[in-house]
């Protein structure tokens, strides 16, 4: 899916002459970006709730180390069970039974079911991407260029706001699908 999106120019700049600030590009969802986002969200939540979860830790250095250790659990090959999460937090002297700000469940459940169980890409993520849900985030210019490539048989032209501008540095790319597929569109 990501390969096809890239072939159609999604997730890249379109060639528009926008320099200040530079033209934005969209985001093609993938496993790495999903995990990176979840880690950032977890780190932010833990830091915002240090006084709730980490009251047994005395120094900022200990609290920083606990946050790092908790966030690192999202990289584990084998996800921990709920009991393992609870014991892990207890070993860190983090209050796993406390409920953080704007939460309804204790930290052990939040960590297990909202972060650890969701950290790895799964079929649900793929289905969300396919139907245009989830983390798809494309600019209107990217979508315009995508539709143009569909309509013209697969030529991916750089976009321009200036009439008659030549894109000598950026040649027309071929998407690489067989012409018979465009006739069905």
Model-derived regions, located:
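Beta-lactam-recognizing serine transpeptidase/beta-lactamase-like catalytic domain environment
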Residues: 1-184
């Amino acid at each position: 899916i990501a390969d096809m999106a890239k072939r159609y120019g999604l997730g890249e700049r379109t060639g528009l002459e926008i320099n200040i600030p530079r033209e934005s590009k969209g985001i093609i969802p993938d496993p790495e970006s999903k995990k990176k986002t979840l880690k950032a969200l977890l780190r932010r939540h833990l830091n915002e709730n240090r006084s709730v979860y980490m009251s047994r830790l005395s120094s900022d250095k200990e609290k920083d180390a606990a946050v790092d250790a908790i966030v690192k659990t999202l990289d584990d090959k084998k996800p921990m069970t709920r009991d393992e999460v609870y014991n892990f937090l207890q070993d860190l002297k983090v209050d796993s039974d406390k409920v953080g700000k704007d939460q309804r469940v204790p930290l052990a459940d939040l960590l297990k079911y909202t972060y650890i169980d969701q950290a790895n890409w799964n079929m649900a993520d793929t289905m969300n991407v396919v139907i245009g849900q989830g983390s798809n985030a494309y600019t209107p210019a990217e979508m315009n260029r995508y539709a143009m490539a569909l309509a013209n048989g697969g030529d991916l032209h750089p976009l321009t706001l200036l009439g008659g501008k030549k894109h000598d540095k950026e040649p027309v790319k071929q998407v690489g699908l067989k012409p018979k597929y465009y006739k069905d569109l």
